[in-house]
Design a protein with these regions (language model features):
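Alpha-helical recognition/docking segments in bacterial nutrient-uptake
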Residues: 1-9, 69, 73-189, 193, ...
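Periplasmic-binding protein-like
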Residues: 132-140, 163, 200-202, 234, ...
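N-terminal helix-turn-helix DNA-binding module of bacterial transcription factors
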Residues: 1-70
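Hinge/beta->alpha junction and helix N-cap segments in small-molecule ligand-binding domains
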Residues: 80-92, 110-119, 141-143, 175-186, ...
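Short acidic/polar active-site loop segments enriched in Thr and Asp
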Residues: 24, 72, 133, 196-198, ...
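Short acidic capping loops at alpha-helix termini that bridge into adjacent secondary structure
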Residues: 197-198, 229-233, 283-288
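Flexible loop/turn connectors
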Residues: 249-352
Length: 352
């Protein structure tokens, strides 16, 4: 068989590897499934390795594990139209999931989707990842409550264990990892405790299930403190610095009496800080700005951003650990709460 040049793209089969190496297909199969096997000689292994390299062969993981009734692969379901690695929050979650799975000998699988809505994206991702041992379902800003409920129903149809991550508490999901900035470390409550009474809120995406809950929590805390709530002081920054910059400028122009802005991500807080500076306002002397997530943006911003550390990577590790426990039968129904931690830095002042 003619050898392929480096620039050619081709995936060889086991029979083609055997032919090129001058060995039997059985020897190739035995060796590729167990590189340490003593049933194949060292010289034969070298010829197989060279043929694999020349043919650009990649093992079909699902097919090779069918006899074991397991793939040791976990499917990640992320209903988002954004590029997977463009979001630091998602990256931290995935880092936690992947590191825990890797420690346990499992691989991570993600299939992108060209669908338009979050529920259609999830349906496609499930179809393309058939053969996984289990799933981890993320929620993103594109998800409404109805979409999340439908996504959970789709996963239930697979008869495979799954864990929900970054999703509000739901009865339909038996295995959940809940990320919470509890009232004790809520940004709004912290600002109230610092003497602020004119507090605006910058949420992520309008219509998202997280935005709805955070809106309710913010309003409830203000009302409990006998502070009037004005819905016009709630804006959406879409988790983007530029959009947050624009929204913060409009907000601070329309409501010059504001003393604090509680942003639901550090990247939005960074955009808001830049807007305040461009308007000639000092942070935190003229306007206090709070973030959320304790990301790199919070640490590198000038001034450094006071924020809520949601321990995102730990949440990802917990989700992977819980799913593997479900796969081996030791977890049937469990909810793990990851509480946030207040990180005080330089963007919030105290009002006497």
């Amino acid at each position: 068989m003619k050898r392929l040049t480096d620039g050619q793209k081709y995936m060889g089969s086991i029979r083609e590897i055997a032919k090129l190496a001058g060995v039997s297909p059985a020897s190739v199969s035995i060796y590729l499934n167990d590189k340490k096997t003593s049933r194949v000689g060292a010289a034969t292994k070298q010829r197989i390795d060279q043929a694999v390299k020349d043919l650009h062969y990649h093992k079909n993981i699902f097919a090779s594990t069918l006899s074991l009734q397991e793939s040791r692969i976990i499917g990640i379901i992320i209903p988002s139209k954004m590029p997977l690695f463009s979001n630091e929050y998602t990256n931290s979650l995935l880092s936690g999931v992947q590191s825990q799975l890797s420690n346990e000998g499992y691989s991570l699988l993600f299939f992108p989707s060209d669908a338009r809505t979050s529920d259609e994206i999830v349906e496609q991702q499930i179809q393309r990842s058939t053969g996984c041992d289990g799933y981890i379902l993320f929620s993103t800003g594109f998800c409404t409550q109805a979409h999340i409920e439908k996504n959970i129903m789709e996963l239930q149809k697979t008869d495979k264990p799954f864990v929900t991550l970054n999703i509000p508490e739901m009865e339909q999901a038996r295995l959940q990892v809940l990320i919470r900035d509890l009232e004790i470390c809520s940004g709004t409550k912290y600002l109230l405790g610092k003497g602020h009474r004119n507090i605006a809120l910058m949420l992520g995406r309008d219509g998202g299930v997280h935005a709805r809950k955070l809106y309710h929590d913010h309003r409830s805390l203000l009302e409990h403190a006998n502070v009037a709530f004005d819905p016009d002081t709630v804006v959406f920054g879409d988790y983007q610095a530029q959009r947050a910059y624009e929204q913060a400028k409009d907000l601070l122009t329309s409501f010059p009496h504001l003393t604090a802005l509680n942003c639901m991500s550090d990247i939005m807080a960074a955009g808001a800080i830049l807007a305040a500076k461009d308007m000639g306002l000092r942070v935190p002397e003229d306007i206090s700005i709070m973030g959320r997530n304790n990301s790199l943006h919070a640490r590198l911003s000038t001034p450094a951003i006071t924020t809520i550390d949601l321990h995102i990577e730990d949440a990802g590790k917990s989700a992977a650990h819980l799913l593997l426990a479900a796969i081996d039968g030791s977890a049937v129904s469990q909810k793990i709460l990851i509480p946030g931690t207040l990180i005080e830095r330089d963007t919030v002042s105290t009002i006497a």
